Amino acid sequence: MFANKKVVVVMPAYNAQKTLRQTYDEVMAQNVVDLVIIVDDASHDDTAAVARKLPHTVVEVHPENRGYGANQKTCYKLALEQGADIIIMVHPDYQYTPKLIPAMASMIGNGLYHCVLGSRILGGCALAGNMPFYKYISNRFLTFAENIFTGAKLSEYHTGYRAFSRQLLEQLPLDANSDDFVFDNQMLAQILWLGYTIAEVSCPTKYFAEASSINFSRSLKYGLGCLWTALQFRLAKMKLIKSKLFPSFS
């Protein structure tokens, strides 16, 4: 709980057996989280079994793998159903430190922002944290291009550490988004489309053996999807196209 607002952490999980408990323990150690929602996207390991042993959790298991974006759709749906006022996504692979949860929750709970990102780029230590060089370069290039198309000034669009207000999540047309990794990018573009300011806090970078990552071919597909999303945003702003991602909001 923060300022009488219910704080819910959502964890989109896939084969996270080795790191789930460690991540969960650190999340709860922050003393502001009321509930953790874990959605297992048909893992091949014991992620679901580990999750069900954790207190103060709601566990949902997809019977078949539906994709990272679809996992998040379930996460946010459940969070809203549970009465969440502040929703924070933390990956259960321990790549993002849960120690930033109080800061992110305070920025939402005090009404300063409706969306806060944990940026690995702001601190300038992404490479020192073992982010692969090709990922760093692609992150910087994509972010530069996306800022041009959207008019924003974010340091990165590609972090999986995010906090949202209930008010914001209820406005987003998330069902129109991809079920794959580009969901993340589409979501941020939709937030900007609505006219919200996105805040950022510096987040340490941690890449290690157990941290989840996508291969080069899927990274390429994701990158192209990000550019297409940003282009659609600009064309829709110019009223040259209509897009289900960016409908006319009244």
Q: Which ranges hold each PLM region?
A:
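Short hydrophobic beta-strand elements that form part
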Residues: 8-12, 37, 61
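Short, well-formed alpha-helical segments that are part of the catalytic scaffolds
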Residues: 15-29
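Donor nucleotide-sugar binding loop of glycosyltransferases
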Residues: 16-19, 43, 97
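Conserved short acidic donor-positioning loop in nucleotide-sugar-dependent glycosyltransferases
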Residues: 27, 41-42, 66, 75
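A conserved acidic beta->alpha catalytic loop
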Residues: 40-49
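Acceptor/aglycone-binding surface of glycosyltransferases and processive sugar-polymer synthases
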Residues: 62-81, 98-181, 208-217, 224-227
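Short beta-strand-to-loop acidic/aromatic patch adjacent to the donor-nucleotide binding site
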Residues: 84-95
